[in-house]
From Swiss-Prot:
It is found in: Cell outer membrane. Pfam families: LamB (PF02264). This is Maltoporin. It comes from Escherichia coli (strain 55989 / EAEC). Belongs to the porin LamB (TC 1.B.3) family. Residues 1-25 form the signal peptide. The lineage of its organism: Bacteria, Pseudomonadati, Pseudomonadota, Gammaproteobacteria, Enterobacterales. Induction: By maltose. Homotrimer formed of three 18-stranded antiparallel beta-barrels, containing three independent channels. The record marks 31, 66, 99, 252, 383, 445 as: Greasy slide, important in sugar transport. It catalyses: beta-maltose(in) = beta-maltose(out). The record marks 143 as: Important in sugar transport. One of its GO terms (biological process) is monoatomic ion transport. It is a multi-pass membrane protein.
Length: 446
C-alpha cells in the first residue's frame, strides 16, 4: 500500500501533463511532393525551363522530392492576447535512390504575439526567421513578392481604411566584402549582410469584391567598418508594388505592377542582391553588377466555370534593364484547366509558353510545354490536396542564346554574360529540340 501511495503523486503529475498537452496541442502543417518519371529518349525524368526565365510551368515538370514540415503551438493565451511559436524545416533531394542524405534548411523559427499592444488592437508583433506575407503564382512556382528571412516586424495595424505592416529582414551574400590581406590585395571571402525594410498597406476595399495592396521595399548592403564592396556593387535599391485582388467566379484574379531599381532587380521579389559576387560550383565567378531597373506586369488567378470546370491562369511581362546590358525581357502565358469527373477524380491539362530576349545579344529563347494528367484529389477544387496524378509532358524549345560560364572569370571577359548560341564556335543555350516525359507524382499540403 505504501508503494501505491508513493506512486500516486507521479500518476497525478503525468495525467496533468497529458491533459495540458491535449489542451495545447501542437499544430502540424506542411507541404510535400515526390514521384517518379521517365524521359522519352531514355533515363530519368528531365525538367524543362527556358534559359533566362526565372521559373517554369510545374505540372508534370518537377524532378525532385521536396518537403516543408511545420510545427507550431500557441504557447500562451490570456483573453485576446497570445504568443505563437512557429517553425519550418525544408528538405530537397533528387529522388534518384532510396537513401538520399541531405542537409535540412531551417527556414522558419519565430514567435508571433497578437494583441500585445493595447493601443493597436488586432496587430501582431513578431521576431525570428519567417515566411513573411509571400505572394506567388502557384502554377509556375514563382514568388514575385517575398522578403522571407530572419527579421522582425509589426503587422496588421488597423488604420481604418486598411491594414499597415512594417518589417525588416536580412539576406546575406557570400564573397561580398573584404578587408586588406597581405600586399594590399583584397580577398573577397566575407559575407555582406543585406537589409530589407518593408512597408505594406493592404486590404483597402476600393470596389465591390476588390482590394488593393501597396508596398515599398528598400534594400541595402550593411557594410562593416574597414571593409569594402566588390567593384560595381549596386549597394542598394527599391521595389515598389501595387496589387489589386478581385473576387470573381468563386475564385480570384490578381493584377500586379512592380518596379525595382539596382540591388532589388536580380531576384525582383524584395530581397537585395548585388553587393557581392556570384559563384559557380563553389569558385569565384563574377560581379553581379545589377545597376539598372526592372518592370513587371503580372495577371494571374484561379476561377471556377460551372460545376465541372476549374482553371488557373497566368500572364506576365518582365523587363530587367541593366547598365551592363546583361538583362532580359521575359514574357510568359499559361493556363491550367481542370475537368472534374467525380468529386475526387479529375483530368488536368497545363499549357505554358515562355519567351526570353537577351538585352546583350537581342536574340530570343522560347519554349512551350504541354502536360496532360489524370488526378485523384481530396475534394473537387483545383486547390484540393493531397493529390496523386499520372502525367505525360511534351516540351518544344528553340534557344538562340545562353550564358558563358567557360573557363575562369579572371581570363574570360564574357564569364557570366549572355552570348549567342554559337559564340566563339561554342554551344550555348539548349539549341532547337523537343522532348517528352511521363510519370507519377503526389502533392500535398495541410
Amino acid at each position: 500500500m505504501m508503494i501505491t501511495l508513493r506512486k500516486l503523486p507521479l500518476a497525478v503529475a503525468v495525467a496533468a501533463g497529458v491533459m495540458s498537452a491535449q489542451a495545447m496541442a501542437v499544430d502540424f502543417h506542411g507541404y510535400a511532393r515526390s514521384g517518379i518519371g521517365w524521359t522519352g529518349s531514355g533515363g530519368e525524368q528531365q525538367c524543362f525551363q527556358t534559359t533566362g526565365a526565372q521559373s517554369k510551368y510545374r505540372l508534370g515538370n518537377e524532378c525532385e522530392t521536396y518537403a516543408e514540415l511545420k510545427l507550431g503551438q500557441e504557447v500562451w493565451k490570456e483573453g485576446d492576447k497570445s504568443f505563437y511559436f512557429d517553425t519550418n524545416v525544408a528538405y530537397s533531394v533528387a529522388q534518384q535512390n532510396d537513401w538520399e542524405a541531405t542537409d535540412p534548411a531551417f527556414r522558419e523559427a519565430n514567435v508571433q504575439g497578437k494583441n500585445l499592444i493595447e493601443w493597436l488592437p488586432g496587430s501582431t508583433i513578431w521576431a525570428g526567421k519567417r515566411f513573411y506575407q509571400r505572394h506567388d503564382v502557384h502554377m509556375i512556382d514563382f514568388y514575385y513578392w517575398d522578403i522571407s528571412g530572419p527579421g522582425a516586424g509589426l503587422e496588421n495595424i488597423d488604420v481604418g481604411f486598411g491594414k499597415l505592416s512594417l518589417a525588416a529582414t536580412r539576406s546575406s551574400e557570400a564573397g561580398g566584402s573584404s578587408s586588406f590581406a597581405s600586399n594590399n590585395i583584397y580577398d573577397y571571402t566575407n559575407e555582406t549582410a543585406n537589409d530589407v525594410f518593408d512597408v505594406r498597406l493592404a486590404q483597402m476595399e476600393i470596389n465591390p469584391g476588390g482590394t488593393l495592396e501597396l508596398g515599398v521595399d528598400y534594400g541595402r548592403a550593411n557594410l562593416r567598418d574597414n571593409y569594402r564592396l566588390v567593384d560595381g556593387a549596386s549597394k542598394d535599391g527599391w521595389l515598389f508594388t501595387a496589387e489589386h485582388t478581385q473576387s470573381v467566379l468563386k475564385g480570384f484574379n490578381k493584377f500586379v505592377v512592380q518596379y525595382a531599381t539596382d540591388s532589388m532587380t536580380s531576384q525582383g521579389k524584395g530581397l537585395s542582391q548585388g553587393s557581392g559576387v556570384a559563384f559557380d560550383n563553389e569558385k569565384f565567378a563574377y560581379n553581379i553588377n545589377n545597376n539598372g531597373h526592372m518592370l513587371r506586369i503580372l495577371d494571374h488567378g484561379a476561377i471556377s466555370m460551372g460545376d465541372n470546370w476549374d482553371m488557373m491562369y497566368v500572364g506576365m511581362y518582365q523587363d530587367i534593364n541593366w547598365d551592363n546590358d546583361n538583362g532580359t525581357k521575359w514574357w510568359t502565358v499559361g493556363i491550367r484547366p481542370m475537368y472534374k469527373w467525380t468529386p475526387i477524380m479529375s483530368t488536368v491539362m497545363e499549357i505554358g509558353y515562355d519567351n526570353v530576349e537577351s538585352q546583350r545579344t537581342g536574340d530570343k529563347n522560347n519554349q512551350y510545354k504541354i502536360t496532360l494528367a489524370q488526378q485523384w484529389q481530396a475534394g473537387d477544387s483545383i486547390w484540393s490536396r493531397p493529390a496523386i496524378r499520372v502525367f505525360a509532358t511534351y516540351a518544344k524549345w528553340d534557344e538562340k542564346w545562353g550564358y558563358d560560364y567557360n573557363g575562369d572569370s579572371k581570363v574570360n571577359p564574357n564569364y557570366g554574360k549572355a552570348v549567342t548560341a554559337d559564340f566563339n564556335g561554342g554551344s550555348f543555350g539548349r539549341g532547337d529540340s523537343d522532348e517528352w516525359t511521363f510519370g507519377a507524382q503526389m502533392e500535398i499540403w495541410w
